[in-house]
Curated annotation (Swiss-Prot):
Domain of life of the organism encoding this protein: Eukaryota
Pfam families: Cadherin, Cadherin_2, Cadherin_tail
Transmembrane segments: 698-718
InterPro entries cross-referenced by the UniProt entry: Cadherin-like_dom (IPR002126), Cadherin-like_sf (IPR015919), Cadherin_CBD (IPR031904), Cadherin_CS (IPR020894), Cadherin_N (IPR013164), Protocadherin/Cadherin-CA (IPR050174)
Name of the protein in question: Protocadherin alpha-4
Organism listed in the record: Homo sapiens (Human)
Domain Cadherin: residue ranges: 30-133, 134-242, 243-350, 351-455, 456-565, 588-678
């Protein structure tokens, strides 16, 4: 096809018109093509893919296909080039009969996303059908007496084509008797007739042969012929005549058999048999008409005898003959046109042309799910079909084309709420009463990974006993995902982190599918009390979603640590301790104190002490405190007692089963004058340089005790003056022992009552006021220590960097140990509230700090309180421990500083009360007096690291 373009304004107008037309066609989603009928296979129709705006490469992936109701196979599309072509023979007369318009309606459907395009292919008529007469020969009998201009009806020809191709012209072969009458303008009347132009004479021409030719208007012209054989008859001059030559009748479809259509009436001017008329159908009518109607030969009534269906035929033409009974019968003719009226007798036809299922729950609004075709064989209002959808569903019907509806998404979907919809589409016509049809479709909602796995609670607490076997199952986490299939497959994993210096995965693991949590190694309560970690649950969707849950695994203590004795010094052999006791001591004199710690917690760390019976069943004058570990005399010593005693002290915890440790104490009874000359802390079997050090220490201790005595006297005098000068401050109760302990960080006092100030009691200094140095330094450093004592009191010290918690001491902070001495213990564990002694400083300031009791003291750490120094000092961090701390029930301070193996024996580990010790007390008490005076003036400071 070639186009020639003009110039100027006309060209621009034409181009604009074509663009507007193309835009209108694209907006309606409809294309129009035309093709001639009887086109050969492969005939080009149109470039349908290009006209629809589709790329050739996407035709196959998007499942490009063509659908046509009842017209399948006539047209096809080449998916390689997108061309619509003729696939099989197209016969317009077969498709549309004699309809003026004939089109093939195609639906072009592509998926991903679903789109529907409507294509109309007009079938152009060609002149491929010649005119056809009902018969090839027609016989007519005409009396010679018929007058001129008599008319004899003929059945015209029919042409299956339309338009000019079906426009017929007739011509009669040349003759002198008859001429041809043109058919009337009424298109329903197809007949024509012969007009007698010259009188007939049987004797001259008994038979006349004529040829009637019908020619259509096509190019080239096609013709059809019929031979007319006219026989000339004698007699009977008048033929029957009907009232009208054409009758028109309206008849409803579906009327019952026997319904009267019309009653015809013909008359004959003759008399007798020549005037009797017999009615019949012409031989030229079709068998279909004869099967639908019947005529009574006497009355001329036409009645229904077959099923009348408007959808089958909208009208019927009946040719009726009236023939008289003369010897030479004459006939008259008329035409009856029966127009069938439509009745609403057909239900709508509903069909799903294409379904795009299932639909994703995140599909956008307006997504086309299905294409629905509706039709009704009735006409007019009876054939007007409307569709409706089930209410309260997130879908709607949209009319996209004549008799086509699209099922589209109207609101958001949520598969977790509704996973499938049962939709019912109802098609209803406009008749009265209306008829309807329904069709149902199940729409499944495809899952989208829009829900993360969820745990029942955000945190779980798990209790696991320590020393569990490796691979032990300790807990199971479970998460639920509201999605389906792969999106609901949950896998579990650890959120990796560091636990101390080790990775979390070295402690626990989680099974990816079951969620079972396993302990990979035995857990140790003393090393790790709480293991807190997170487990991630992640689904298998794309992209995957996940959530976390926190597990707090508390490691429960088991009695897996035996009590550990605190050795008097590092490198001591055998744990045996030698003590020198004067013969003159009385009842209750404390000989020594056995100290032990247990790395466990609770009852497993609650220690008790028992004195094992001696060999031979001999009674010994000693006992041990059940919970204090203090070895004291049970009576006054006499000469019947053995001079040497080997005491075995059994230290036992309260676990199940109980674990024990044994301490050996060697007690030697000496005269009072000999006691200072012997070492009260020598180990059994000590020889060599150790013995020489003991002799040197004796002289140093004597010197220190002398100085201490002066300090004690000064302190007593000062205290007496204070008590007499300030009577309102409260008197000191006689006999109430007060312990003042001085150390490098200040002075601490211990009493069973809280007092605003420290004052000495009445009675001997040994029982009223005792001052001790927490430890004796090496002889080479003792003079330096005496010189720096005052400086230590005046300025705070930094935390001692040369000590750390041991595992046993850390665990000891969780022990629950009760004291039995000095009215300290009131109830056992789990019983009523316990009254514990309070260690407080001499300062009266209310803002003094508080800390927990010292580790290893055998006292519940929740019951003791230290108060010392002004202000609110910093609390100790984990792993920090003061250099020295006080053991209740014993005038001593434990030092846990690690000393070299060759250092002086630690005098604070095991304590005796000989004269040598009394001398030391006096010296230390003087230092304590000075310290207390500084505290009362508010000038003392406390080291924060000793909390």
């Amino acid at each position: 096809m070639e186009f020639s373009w003009g110039s100027g304004q006309e060209s621009r107008r034409l181009l604009l018109l074509l663009l507007l037309l193309a835009a209108w066609e694209a907006g309606n989603g409809q294309l129009h093509y035309s093709v001639s009928e009887e086109a050969k296979h492969g005939t080009f129709v149109g470039r349908i893919a290009q006209d629809l705006g589709l790329e050739l490469a996407e035709l196959v992936p998007r499942l490009f296909r063509v659908a046509s109701k009842g017209r399948g196979g006539l047209l096809e599309v080449n998916l390689q080039n997108g061309i619509l072509f003729v696939n099989s023979r197209i016969d317009r007369e077969e498709l549309c009969r004699r309809s003026a318009e004939c089109s093939i309606h195609l639906e072009v459907i592509v998926d991903r996303p679903l789109q529907v395009f409507h294509v109309d292919v007009e079938v152009r008529d060609i002149n491929d059908n010649p005119p056809v007469f009902p018969a090839t020969q027609k016989n007519l009998s005409i009396a010679e007496s018929r007058p001129l201009d008599s008319r004899f009806p003929l059945e015209g020809a029919s042409d299956a084509d339309i338009g000019e191709n079906a426009l017929l012209t007739y011509r009669l072969s040349p003759n002198e008797y008859f001429s041809l009458e043109k058919p009337p303008d009424d298109e329903l009347v197809k007949g024509l007739g012969l007009i007698l132009r010259k009188s007939l004479d049987r004797e001259e021409a008994p038979e006349i042969f004529l040829v009637l030719t019908a020619t259509d208007g096509g190019k080239p012209e096609l013709t059809g012929t019929v031979q007319l054989l006219i026989t000339v008859l004698d007699a009977n001059d008048n033929a029957p005549a009907f009232d009208r030559t054409i009758y028109k009748v309206r008849l409803l479809e579906n009327v019952p058999n026997g319904t009267l259509v019309i009653k015809l009436n013909a008359s004959d001017l003759d008399e007798g048999l020549n005037g009797d008329i017999v009615y019949s159908f012409s031989n030229d009518i079709s068998p279909n008409v004869k099967s639908k109607f019947h005529i009574d030969p006497i009355t001329g009534q036409i009645i229904v005898k077959g099923y009348i269906d408007f959808e089958e035929s909208k009208s019927y033409e009946i040719i009726v003959e009236g023939i008289d009974k003369g010897q030479l019968p004459l006939s008259g003719h008329c035409r009856v046109i029966v127009e069938v009226e439509d009745n609403n007798d057909n239900v709508p036809d509903l069909e799903f042309k294409s379904l795009s299922l299932p639909i994703r729950e995140d599909a956008p609004l307006g997504t086309v799910i299905a294409l629905i075709s509706v039709s009704d064989k009735d006409m007019g209002v009876n054939g007007l079909v409307t569709c409706s959808l089930t209410s309260h569903v997130p879908f709607k019907l949209v009319s996209t084309f004549k008799n086509y509806y699209s099922l589209v998404l109207d609101s958001a979907l949520d598969r977790e709420s509704v996973s499938a919809y049962e939709l019912v589409v109802t098609a209803r016509d406009g008749g009265s009463p209306s008829l309807w049809a329904t069709a149902s479709v199940s729409v499944e909602v495809a899952d989208v990974n829009d829900n993360a796995p969820a745990f029942a609670q955000p945190e779980y607490t798990v209790f696991v006993k320590e020393n569990n076997p490796p691979g032990c199952h300790i807990f199971t986490v479970s998460a639920w995902d509201a999605d389906a299939q792969e999106n609901a497959l949950v896998s579990y994993s650890l959120v990796e982190r560091r636990v101390g210096e080790r990775a979390l995965s070295s402690y626990v693991s989680v099974h990816a599918e079951s969620g079972k949590v396993y302990a990979l190694q035995p857990l140790d309560h003393e090393e790790l009390e709480l293991l807190q970690f997170q487990v991630t649950a992640r689904d298998a969707g794309v992209p995957p979603l996940g959530s976390n849950v926190t597990l707090q695994v508390f490691v429960l203590d088991e009695n897996d640590n035996a009590p550990a004795l605190l050795a008097p010094r590092a490198g001591g052999t055998g744990g045996a301790v030698s003590e020198l006791v004067p013969w003159s001591v009385g009842v209750g004199h404390v000989v020594a104190k056995v100290r032990a710690v247990d790395a466990d917690s609770g009852y497993n760390a609650w220690l008790s002490y028992e004195l094992q019976p001696g060999t031979g069943g001999a009674r010994i004058p000693f006992r041990v405190g059940l919970y204090t570990g203090e070895i004291s005399t049970t009576r006054a010593l006499d000469e019947t007692d053995a001079p040497r005693h080997r005491l075995l002290v059994l230290v036992k915890d309260h676990g199940e089963p109980a674990l024990t440790a044994t301490a050996t104490v060697l007690v030697s009874l000496v005269e009072s004058g000999q006691a200072p000359k012997a070492s009260s802390r020598a180990l059994v079997g000590a020889v060599g340089p150790d013995a020489a050090l003991v002799d040197v220490n004796v002289y140093l201790i004597i010197a220190i005790c002398a100085v201490s005595s002066l300090l004690v006297l000064t302190l007593l005098l000062y205290t007496a003056l204070r008590c007499s000068a300030l009577p309102t401050e409260g008197a000191c109760a006689p006999g109430k022992p007060t312990l003042v302990c001085s150390s490098a960080v200040g002075s601490w006092s211990y009493s069973q009552q809280r007092r605003p100030r420290v004052c000495s009691g009445e009675g001997p200094p040994k029982t009223d006021l005792m001052a001790f140095s927490p430890s004796l330094p090496d002889s080479r450093d003792r003079e330096d220590q005496l010189q720096t004592t005052e400086e230590s009191f005046a300025k705070p010290r930094q935390p001692n960097p040369d000590w750390r918690y041991s595992a046993s001491l850390r665990a000891g902070m969780h022990s629950s140990v009760h004291l039995e001495e000095a009215g300290i213990l009131r109830a056992g564990p789990g019983g009523p509230d316990q009254q514990w002694p309070t260690v407080s400083s001499a300062t009266p300031e209310p803002e003094a700090g508080e800390v927990s009791p010292p580790v290893g003291a055998g006292v519940n750490s929740n019951s003791w309180t230290f108060k010392y120094g002004p202000g609110n000092p910093k609390q100790s961090g984990p792993g920090e421990l003061p250099d020295k701390f006080i053991i209740p029930g014993s005038p001593a301070i434990i030092s846990i500083r690690q000393e070299p193996t060759n250092s002086q024996i630690d005098k604070s580990d095991f304590i005796t009360f000989g004269k040598k010790e009394e001398t030391k007390k006096k010296k230390k008490k003087k230092k304590g007096n000075k310290t207390q005076e500084k505290k009362e003036k508010g000038n003392s400071t406390t080291d924060n690291s000793d909390q």
